[in-house]
Amino acid sequence: MQQSTLLKPVSCYGIGVHSGKRTQLTIEPAKENTGIIFIRTDISSENNYIEASYFNVSDTLLSTTISNDHKVQISTIEHLMAALWGCSIDNAIIKIDGPEVPIMDGSSKPFVFMIECAGKKLQNAPKKYLKILKDIKVVHKDCELYCTPSDHMTVDLTIDFSSKAIGRQNLSFRDQESFTKNIADARTFGFIRDVDYLKSKGLAQGASFENAIGIDEQDKILNPNGLRYEDEFVRHKLLDLFGDLYTNGTSIVSAIKGYKTSHALNNELLHRIFSDTTSYKFVTSSEL
């Protein structure tokens, strides 16, 4: 299997869910073995370049933020990263004129639509995979995430909220190609009781029912059109997981299981994997 990029550039406008700032984002084709690169076009210097890598993740509070050595950062990259993973885009340059990726409708679907509109181009280089060779586990209180060796990528994810609107939900995922149909349109969510506090901390400045599922104090869904799926919450957590894990630069070949995962836990798993060179190897499709 070959690496792929976009056939042509594609752009969108939107606001950041936390910053509330309106930005333009463009996804452009990139050469083989480039990976995913973000460029802050509002910063006119060579310091505006950030590789979308797990080791550049600088903040995981409510979203995933990447930064470079010059303290230039881009936040809320996970929904776009999930779309790139789900569409099997290995190489892309992402130009953005602000500090946060637009939230769009709160899911990955608008980014998937953009990529599909641009088209995909196969490249003259083999696609790489990260194959897990031993059991790896990360735990924080009652939250855990672990991966074990497997010949295929599988994910089993469970979430557990005290809110009756969410409760305990479980989802198993075994086919990357089904991401765009079954996972990509699952939206982010939040509780109305937290809004004032988040806004006081400079977060959720752009949040609305147009880009997030809102849950009130009586555990009712406030969005006029309700949910897209009965288990939309766990689907979105799975979306976040894929986006965060794609900061390793490849698709992971492993059986992955998670309970009450978070952006922090997702990133910690990658650090744990790459801290032990005997726990993984990079392979091509012919070596799987």
Swiss-Prot record:
Annotated GO CC locations: membrane
Pfam families xref list: LpxC (PF03331)
Q: Give any single GO term for biological process.
A: lipid A biosynthetic process
**E.C. number, please?**
3.5.1.108
Query: Residues in the active site?
Result: 263
Q: Which GO terms describe its molecular function?
A: metal ion binding; UDP-3-O-acyl-N-acetylglucosamine deacetylase activity
Q: Which reactions is this enzyme annotated as catalysing?
A: a UDP-3-O-[(3R)-3-hydroxyacyl]-N-acetyl-alpha-D-glucosamine + H2O = a UDP-3-O-[(3R)-3-hydroxyacyl]-alpha-D-glucosamine + acetate
Keywords for this entry? Answer: Hydrolase, Lipid A biosynthesis, Lipid biosynthesis, Lipid metabolism, Metal-binding, Zinc
Give the superkingdom in one word.
Bacteria
Report the family membership.
Belongs to the LpxC family.
Task: Tell me, in a sentence or two, what this protein's role is.
Answer: Catalyzes the hydrolysis of UDP-3-O-myristoyl-N-acetylglucosamine to form UDP-3-O-myristoylglucosamine and acetate, the committed step in lipid A biosynthesis.
What name is this protein filed under? UDP-3-O-acyl-N-acetylglucosamine deacetylase
Identify the gene encoding this protein: lpxC
